[in-house]
């Protein structure tokens, strides 16, 4: 074996990876890089245009043996990474649900990463735990949650990464609560309930918690009820399981479903669940953000009868990913289920039982200082600004909905909910026109047999997204393929919405023209 070739001179970074001056120099460069990115973000195709595997072709097969400069690395970020990004912060981004960023959120994240504390219990970093408890009570007050969900009452809140974590945590606590009563040997009798619009993370969480997939119930919704869960249908499903000797124990209601932002009737569903002694969780991942506005607060009426409530601040609250806020009425149910107390974590503060050890409120042990960025957001912008920020997106979505209704080729599939518009090229206005055009050439019947409205709308969406000027996604609900236009990017303004609609109209005209030509000329 040969000896290593040690250079006599080395940079401060090589001798000290946390050299303060080198951190300052490189930090300024990264901030400048991001500032230019945001300044020029509209120049990029919103949806990445690269092909699968593009990056492996550009990067070396092995990690570098010698250090590389930050200048070289940032150049590669610009040349190789940025082209592979879908630009969620673009003002022309309307896909999925938003992930709204802000200066305060980004800098709060930077502070948290800089401190790099691991706040699994109080003693490991008291400020991390205490700030989280305070901020969660602030947010509860903004949402007008019952005192029973706050630390000033008998409950409390915790920040997690995602809704999936929040639901898994609550299902696990609810599972243990019921099994402590009926015996753990009966776990295969436990049944969970959602609707056919409930987010997939619910059933994924139930599976991880050991609930048999055979015991997942998806209550059917319909367009008549705007795809919200019907209490009578829920009761019928629960009673059927009880009659079969099964044990209903968990209901997940949704305020703002992913597909259409449908709102389940929380109060009525809680009444049904109460009759069977079930744990009720309210998943308000998207729409819960808007419920700090008084005009939307009624959407979560009935929360006082639920056991837990969560929303994702990283979606629509100017707070960078990740930050899911979960409140529970009975924190002891989490602690009993998730507590760990090995010798190496024992300390006097925990022994006093006067502090919160958040490790016992979650699945993982390690945890990030998420409350710091939320604290910066709340202090930097204030409640009034945040409310108006949310309202501006709702207003822009209402404007887009109006534009859709003014074009006879399109229809709004379900009434706009919050800042999401679900629309499509309509059957009556489009298919009939195509049929009439082709019928004159003797091809009308062939069109009706071979082409579907869903195909036309899918082609429209792909045409729009491939152009790169705006980005939307779709949903398929009750057999209806629809385009989703979700307003929520921080930089979006009304003129961007107008531009987006013009893009949709132009691509619709092109798609319909191609359809007519391909059918009538065959």
From Swiss-Prot:
- Which top EC class applies here? lyase
What family is this protein classified in? Belongs to the group II decarboxylase family.
Name of the protein described by the UniProt record? L-tyrosine/L-DOPA decarboxylase 2
- What use has been found for this protein in biotech? An heterologous biosynthetic pathway of mescaline is reconstructed in Nicotiana benthamiana plants and yeast cells expressing Lophophora williamsii genes TyDC2, CYP76AD131, OMT1 and OMT11, thus providing a sustainable production of phenylethylamine-derivated natural products.
Reactions it catalyzes: L-tyrosine + H(+) = tyramine + CO2; L-dopa + H(+) = dopamine + CO2
- What Pfam families does the record tag this protein with? Pyridoxal_deC (PF00282)
One GO molecular-function entry: pyridoxal phosphate binding
User: Keyword NAD, does the record have it?
Assistant: no
InterPro entries given for it? Aromatic_deC, PyrdxlP-dep_de-COase, PyrdxlP-dep_Trfase, PyrdxlP-dep_Trfase_major, PyrdxlP-dep_Trfase_small, Pyridoxal-P_BS
Its BP terms in the Gene Ontology are:
amino acid metabolic process; carboxylic acid metabolic process
Its organism's taxonomic lineage begins at: Eukaryota, Viridiplantae, Streptophyta, Embryophyta, Tracheophyta
Tissue-level expression reads: Strongly expressed in all tissues, particularly in thick roots.
| Residues bearing the modification N6-(pyridoxal phosphate)lysine | 315
Q: Its Enzyme Commission number?
A: 4.1.1.25, 4.1.1.28
The organism is Lophophora williamsii (Peyote)
Which Gene Ontology cellular component terms are annotated? cytoplasm
Job of this protein: Aromatic amino acid decarboxylase participating in the biosynthesis of natural products derived from phenylethylamine, including mescaline, a natural hallucinogen potentially used in psychotherapeutic treatments. Catalyzes the decarboxylation of L-tyrosine and L-DOPA.
Residues holding pyridoxal 5'-phosphate: 163-164, 258, 312
sequence repeat ranges, renumbered to this chain: 75-132, 135-186
Pathway as given in its UniProt record: Aromatic compound metabolism; Alkaloid biosynthesis
Give the source's domain of life in one word: Eukaryota
Q: Where is this region: 2 X approximate tandem repeats?
A: 75-186
Cofactor(s) essential for the protein: pyridoxal 5'-phosphate
Q: What keywords is this UniProt entry annotated with? A: Alkaloid metabolism, Decarboxylase, Lyase, Pyridoxal phosphate, Repeat
């Amino acid at each position: 074996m040969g000896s290593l070739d040690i250079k006599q001179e080395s940079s401060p970074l090589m001798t000290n990876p946390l050299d303060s001056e080198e951190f300052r120099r490189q930090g300024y460069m990264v901030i400048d890089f991001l500032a230019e990115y945001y300044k020029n973000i509209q120049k990029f195709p919103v949806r990445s245009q690269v092909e699968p595997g593009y990056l492996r072709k550009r990067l070396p097969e092995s990690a570098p043996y010698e250090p590389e400069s930050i200048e070289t690395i940032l150049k590669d970020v610009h040349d190789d990474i940025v082209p592979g990004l879908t630009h969620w912060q673009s003002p022309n981004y309307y896909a999925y649900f938003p992930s709204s960023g802000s200066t305060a959120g980004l800098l709060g994240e930077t502070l948290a990463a800089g401190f790099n504390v691991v706040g699994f219990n109080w003693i490991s970093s008291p400020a991390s735990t205490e700030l989280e408890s305070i901020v969660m009570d602030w947010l509860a007050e903004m949402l007008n949650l019952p005192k029973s969900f706050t630390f000033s009452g008998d409950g409390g809140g915790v920040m997690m990464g995602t809704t999936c974590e929040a639901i898994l945590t609550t299902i696990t606590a609810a599972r243990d609560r019921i099994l402590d009563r009926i015996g753990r040997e009966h776990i295969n009798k436990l049944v969970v309930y959602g609707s056919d619009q409930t987010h997939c993370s619910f059933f994924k969480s139930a599976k991880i918690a050991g609930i048999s997939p055979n015991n997942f119930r998806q209550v059917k919704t319909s367009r008549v009820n705007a795809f919200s869960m019907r209490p009578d249908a829920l009761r019928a499903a629960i009673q059927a399981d009880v009659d079969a000797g099964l044990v209903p124990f968990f209901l997940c209601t949704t305020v703002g479903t992913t597909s259409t932002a449908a709102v389940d009737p929380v109060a009525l569903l809680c009444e049904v669940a109460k009759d069977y002694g079930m744990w009720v969780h309210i998943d308000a991942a998207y729409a819960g953000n808007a419920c700090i506005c008084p005009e939307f607060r009624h959407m979560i009426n009935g929360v006082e009868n639920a056991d837990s409530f969560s929303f994702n601040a990283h979606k629509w609250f100017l707070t960078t990913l990740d930050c899911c806020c979960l409140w529970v009425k009975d924190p002891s149910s989490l602690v009993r289920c998730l507590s760990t107390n090995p010798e190496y974590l024992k300390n006097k503060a925990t022994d006093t039982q006067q502090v919160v050890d958040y490790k016992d409120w979650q699945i993982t042990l390690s945890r990030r200082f998420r409350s710091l960025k939320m604290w910066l957001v709340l202090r930097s912008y204030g409640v009034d600004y945040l409310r108006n920020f949310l309202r501006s997106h709702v207003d822009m979505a209402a404007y887009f909905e109006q534009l859709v209704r003014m074009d006879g080729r399109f229809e709004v599939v379900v009434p706009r909910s919050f800042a999401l518009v679900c629309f499509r090229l309509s059957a009556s206005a489009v298919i009939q026109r195509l049929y009439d055009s082709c019928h004159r050439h003797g091809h009308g019947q062939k069109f009706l047999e071979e082409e579907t409205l869903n195909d036309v709308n899918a082609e429209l969406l792909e045409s729009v997204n491939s152009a790169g000027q705006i980005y939307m996604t779709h949903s398929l609900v009750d057999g209806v393929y629809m385009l989703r236009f979700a307003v929520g990017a921080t930089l979006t303004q009304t003129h961007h919405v107008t531009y987006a609609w013009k893009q949709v109209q132009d691509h619709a005209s092109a798609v319909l023209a191609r359809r007519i030509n391909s059918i009538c000329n065959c």
